[in-house]
């Protein structure tokens, strides 16, 4: 019986998002063309340890998953594998688990493992790499807050979902002269809120990176009223701090020790209603932003990531993460990528353009001059340590 071809493994860790299946499909097709068999490990990193769980992947079995949301391999953001990311807050994975994973790859003749995930999943991948496993990373987060890459797939789809919600809220807000507050995802970074707020015609955008006050938010509503616009759309990232610096959470915990954020939209709506005597409603998109069909941009980006990851394995360039550095797909050490947080720059062209359009960010008028050149800025305000786990 002839020996089987060399194998490449792939897994998806952390929260799901549109585009994961596009990565799996692209990696499988690229591996086939280079003479590899593809194995998909199930339920994230859990599939590497006892009981080992995997299934063969072929171009035929992955032929129809390009437009499918979620991940055919399953995923988990809990379990035995976990690695916190942050200053002095990195959890070491049990050495026995690391050895189980290494043994699994050896016994299955897997020459390289493609790990698709966010900062927490890539922190796990880095520990596997440090243990000697042949690992390559693919970045995934709808928040777009992972350092080392200009964009991650899933982000554009999440923005499209939030933009569609704003389009729909616009008509009902205008009809009933209401203030509508849309809460979107964005734990440490306001990328979704910023892009959706611009694309969906928002009037106020509240971000983790820009301090704001209720007085300025209400002033924007009053300004619109005076101009004959008796409705206002407010977009707020779930990680936007209250004016006193506090984060709003729902009292529970999400992934292991991570505090689950949520509720800032309701607080903003209630405060506006109290201060102005106007009707204000809050809407939370939540996991709707993670589901559904990926946009064309996300399909293209995910496909490029998957193909490039396989080529990194083929070239033996382990410990690297693929990244998008327009216009090229490149790679960067995983350790470097998970060390930095990508946040919205308050002086960026996108923020300046939004201000020029009349969009408010809840900050003082002196800080709201579009296309100003304030000189060097300190780091983003309220920048928390990287304590997320995916």
Task: Please place each PLM-identified region on the residue numbering.
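A glycine- and small-aliphatic-rich helix-loop capping segment at beta-alpha/alpha-beta transitions
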Residues: 25-34, 54-61, 127-137, 153-157, ...
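Flexible loop/turn connectors
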Residues: 302-314
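Accessory alpha-helical/coil subdomains and C-terminal extensions
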Residues: 104, 115-117, 123-127, 134, ...
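Short beta-strand segments
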Residues: 11-12, 41-42, 74-75, 115-117, ...
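Short, acidic/small-residue loops that bind anionic groups at enzyme active sites
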Residues: 35, 39-42, 128-152, 156-159, ...
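A cross-family phosphate/adenosyl-ligand binding-site feature
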Residues: 1-13, 21-109, 116, 120, ...
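Glycine- and acidic-rich phosphate- and metal-coordinating loops
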Residues: 281-289
């Amino acid at each position: 019986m002839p020996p089987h071809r060399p194998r490449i493994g792939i897994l998806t860790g952390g929260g799901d998002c549109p585009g994961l299946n596009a990565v799996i499909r692209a990696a499988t097709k690229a591996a086939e063309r280079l003479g590899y068999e593809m194995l998909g490990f199930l339920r994230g990193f859990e599939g590497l340890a006892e009981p080992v769980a995997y299934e063969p992947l072929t171009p035929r079995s992955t032929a129809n998953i390009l437009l499918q949301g979620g991940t055919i391999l399953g995923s988990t953001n809990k379990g035995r594998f976990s690695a916190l990311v942050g200053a002095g807050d990195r959890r070491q994975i049990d050495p026995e688990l690391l050895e189980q994973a290494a043994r699994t790859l050896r016994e299955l003749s897997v020459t390289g493992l493609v790990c698709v995930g966010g900062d927490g999943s890539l922190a796990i991948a880095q520990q596997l790499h440090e243990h000697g496993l042949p690992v390559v990373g693919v970045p995934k987060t709808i928040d777009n807050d992972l350092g080392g890459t200009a964009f991650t797939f899933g982000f554009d789809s999440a923005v499209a979902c939030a933009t569609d919600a704003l389009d729909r809220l616009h008509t009902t807000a205008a009809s009933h002269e209401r203030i509508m507050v849309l809460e979107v995802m964005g734990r440490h970074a306001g990328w979704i809120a910023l892009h959706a707020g611009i694309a969906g015609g928002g009037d106020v955008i509240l971000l983790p990176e820009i301090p704001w006050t209720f007085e300025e938010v209400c002033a924007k509503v009053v300004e619109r009223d005076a101009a004959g616009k008796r409705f206002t759309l407010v977009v707020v990232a779930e990680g936007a701090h209250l004016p006193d610096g506090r984060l709003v959470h729902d009292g529970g915990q999400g992934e292991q020790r991570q505090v689950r954020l949520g509720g800032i939209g309701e607080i903003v709506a209630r405060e506006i209603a109290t201060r102005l005597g106007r009707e204000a409603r809050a809407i939370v998109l939540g996991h709707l932003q993670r589901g559904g069909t990926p946009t064309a941009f996300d399909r293209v980006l995910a496909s490029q990531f998957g193909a490039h990851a396989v080529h990194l394995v083929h070239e033996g360039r382990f410990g690297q993460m693929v990244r998008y550095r327009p216009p090229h797909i490149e790679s960067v050490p995983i350790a470097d990528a998970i060390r930095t947080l990508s946040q919205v720059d308050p002086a960026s062209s996108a923020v300046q353009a939004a201000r020029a359009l009349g969009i408010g960010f809840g900050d003082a008028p002196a800080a709201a001059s579009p296309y100003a050149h304030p000189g060097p800025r300190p780091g983003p305000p309220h920048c928390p340590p990287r304590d997320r786990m995916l």
